[in-house]
Amino acid sequence: MKYIEFEEIDSTNTYIHDHYQELDDDTIVRAHYQTHGRGRSNHIWEADKNEQLLFSYYMKQNVDPLKVSAIMAYAIVTVLRMKQINAFIKWPNDIYINNQKIAGILVETIYESTLQGIIIG
């Protein structure tokens, strides 16, 4: 697994999308701050510097992006509940604690005539 870290970047998902041809399978891109973070439907995702986990994961496997999103949301909620934190999933990709959104999962695909990879952010 490869790990790339930035102090500041426009978006970890955008970085992977723009550089996927140079990246290995199983690459994580992390940032302390994103200037143009985004969620589903091009919604803006804002976070104060060093206040949130901002990262994306790139994999070259051919898997169903909808299933990946659901599995990731379920995994996060399961870990939080193991820690006695009452978290829940708001379909399709948001994680909530005490009716406050704490995370969103953005899954994007990269196609160039065929599937080149999936980005999970």
Where is each model-derived feature located?
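Short conserved micro-motifs on helix faces and helix-strand junctions that flank
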Residues: Q34-H36, W91, I120
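Short, acidic (Asp/Glu-rich) active-site segment that either coordinates a divalent metal cofactor
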Residues: S113-G121
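N-terminal lobe of the biotin/lipoate ligase/transferase fold
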Residues: M1-I85, A103, E108-S113
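Glycine- and Gly-Pro-enriched alpha-helical subdomains that act as flexible
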Residues: I89-W91, Y96-I97, L106
